[in-house]
Structures are given as C-alpha cells and as structure tokens.
Amino acid sequence: MIPVRGLEGRKVAVLGLGRSGLATARALQAGGAEPLLWDDSPEARANAEGQGFAVTDLTRERAFEDVALLVTSPGIPHLYPAPNPVIARAMAAGVPVDNDIGLFFRSFATRDWDAFDQMPRVVCVTGSNGKSTTTALIHHILAESGRPTQMAGNIGRGVLDLDPARDGEVVVLELSSYQTDLARALTPDVAVFTNLSPDHLDRHGGMGGYFAAKRRLFAEGGPDRAVIGVDEPEGLYLAGQLSVAPEDDRVIRISAGQKLERFGWAVFARKGFLAEWRKGRQMASIDLRAMPGLPGAHNHQNACAAYAACRTLGLAPRQIEEALGSFKGLPHRSQLVGERNGVRFVNDSKATNVDSAAKALQAFPKIRWIAGGLGKDGGIAALRPHLDAVVKAYLIGHSARDFALQMGATDHEICETMDRAVVRAAEEAQPGEVVLLAPAAASFDQYPNFEKRGEDFMERVKALL
C-alpha cells in the first residue's frame, strides 16, 4: 500500500466505493487522514461499513464542512455531461477534487529513496487504443529483463494498492482520460501517448476536451521523456508542441507505417519490421512477424511504444527483442481462441470503437466478422474503407439493424445473439479464413462489460472445437 501523505488529521471525503475507492480509503487511513465514504449504492455502503470505514451522507447540506479534499472514482462525471451532485456540492463549497492517481503522485516518493542506488521510475501510458497491451508489454519486458516492476491503474491493481517502491523499480501505469482529466498531480518520468480516436466524448464535452484530458499527462514539469504516436493529427501536434526542434531526442516519435528517419529519436514499424533510428542512424531492427503475441499493425504500434519506453529506461535492443517474443498478449485483444478445419477464431472484444475495430480488420486477409452491440455515434460508417477483407458480417445486439444499413455491398446477416453468430460464422467459414469478434460497439446492451462478451464468444467457440 502507498500511504497518502500530507493530509494527517484531516477529513477526506471519498466518493465511489468500488476497487479504487476502497483502496483510496485504506491508503488515506494509513497516512493518518480520516476518510468519510459515500456511494449511491446501499450494497457498496454496507460493504464499506463491514470493513470498518465511516460512511457519511455526502448528499446532505453542509456535508463538506471541515473537509479538506474530495477523492472521486474515475467513472463518476465531474463536469460533462453534468457534474455528479456530490462533486457539484464540493466544488460549490470550495473543496478541491482529486482522484487516486493524483494522490499516488503526491505520496509515491519517500525519504528512504535517498539510500537507493537507482531512483524508482514511473511510466504512464495513455491514448484511445492499445493502452492495456502497451502497458502490459512494458511491464513484461522489464520483468523478463530482471528489473523490479509493478503494474497498476486502469489495468491490474489500483495505484494506491501498490507496494512501496524498491531500489531501481519501475512502476507502469495505464491511465484513461477519466483518470488524467481529474488528477491534481501528474509527474511521470516517461509518458506514452499511443493514438487518439473518438471515444467517451460525452464525458469530455467533445473531441477537444478528450484530447485535452490526455494531453495533461505531458504538461509542463511533466515527463523527462515522451513517447508519442504520430499516426494521427493530435499526436503530430503533441510531438511538435513538446519538441524544441525535429532533432530533439527527449520526444520519441512512433508509427505503425511511416518512416521517421529524420527525427532525433524515432521507432517505427513497416512491413512487419521494427526500426529504431537516432540522430540519422539506425540503431536496431526487429522482425515483429516472429512475435505470436503481437499480430497486426495495431500491435506493431504497441510494440514500438513499449520498445521506445524501455529504451529510455536503459534496456538494450536484444533484451527487448527476447521479451517481445515471449509475450502472450492480453485476453480479449486479438486473442486466438482456437482453430478448426483451417479456420481460426479470434477474440477482440476490446474493439469497442470504430478505430480499434478498423485495426483488427486490417490484421487478417479473410474475415468472418462478428460485430454489433451498443453502437456509438456514427455507427460503423467510417469502417467502409476497411471492409475489403470481410467475407461476411454477422451482426448482433442493439445496433445490428443500424449496422446492417451501413454495410454497403458487404455481405451480412442479422443474428441478434452471440450464440447464433458464432454458429453461423463457423458453418460458413472456409479454410484460411478467420472468425473475428471485433464488435465496434460497447457491450452494455447484452453484457455487463467487454470481458463478459469475450468470455461468451470463447465459450461458444470452444464448444465447437
């Protein structure tokens, strides 16, 4: 646990009692603060009381008298589409609002670091797609290379549940826009921006607000090194803003398709090969086609980001290459479930938006595509240029009929349910084809989350194998 410092003897309100909320309460208590907990759910409140915490109704008048800080969970809106009433009450009372990420950065460093031979480092990864894989890949490379490392944030443990840092340890954090938007302190040693595509726009008031939330990780006084994906305009802009000149090697540009040889430091992938260039010279090359856990151009971008981050931490190219080869990938992200009669079944349930689905559709030459769910603004119209590899689509969920209207000349069938979609795709698939779940939609119409959707797909596939 990371005890929260600087709030000794003060009352701190905690809103939202899921994993991060309860971890925050424990860390506040360990640091000497008095946490006051609240959640709209009676079950969550009862669970907190059962663990010995004080539950206080933060919706009542004058609830924030003598409260030093409100700490809120990332899923609770603080501005758009409308502030949560408890957060609005705190802001009206002049009480600062923070989250567990902000508390982590104010409390992570301790006095005993003076005795360390090598200071602990923090690497933060943000972006629209590829965050989890990139974070897990950095963590895996460090562990395989013998560096002490922990992983947390939007993946793994809550940040305040981490163990105190050891000599030379690297903490790798995946941060969503919800987390970067509200944290009052963001001071990573290395920050990674993978890419940007429309997502969570209702929470940020539009695309500009969404990008601004991500960009906070790179504010002045932020990272010593920045790894920036430049395959979208926002990444190009951010890299330019952070660089004093093209040869500035504090910014490492990465790409899954462009040659970037003219910059001070760059890592890019073309035709399945990763190349590192620094000050006009090629430093390393890796054949990514030999990495079974990293299929497709989107995973090659993730590999570039992880490679660049690990190079800033002092790892050698060959160390990184060996670790890339042993990476198994993450569940629900280009996950090979099995093969039957020459047909592969791939679970990419995490492809919840158009951009991530487009990357999945570019990874295989012949696809039986299972798509649908709770569609997002614009549906799948933007995917039309990426449907050439789709032999047929099998549409499920709330948006099945809307998606059917946007399929153009691509063959498709409305299946409604995962069960029928898997059966029909398996019946019609030919050797050499891939049955791919890449929904391009949220899961909440039929499942509690994308993980449960992916598990359902895998169970139904395994029943056929």
Swiss-Prot record:
Disulfide bonds: none annotated. The keyword Isomerase does not apply. Pfam families: Mur_ligase_C (PF02875), Mur_ligase_M (PF08245), MurD-like_N (PF21799). Its EC number is 6.3.2.9. It catalyses: UDP-N-acetyl-alpha-D-muramoyl-L-alanine + D-glutamate + ATP = UDP-N-acetyl-alpha-D-muramoyl-L-alanyl-D-glutamate + ADP + phosphate + H(+). Pathway: Cell wall biogenesis; peptidoglycan biosynthesis. Its main location: cytoplasm. This is UDP-N-acetylmuramoylalanine--D-glutamate ligase. It comes from Cereibacter sphaeroides (strain ATCC 17025 / ATH 2.4.3). The gene is murD.
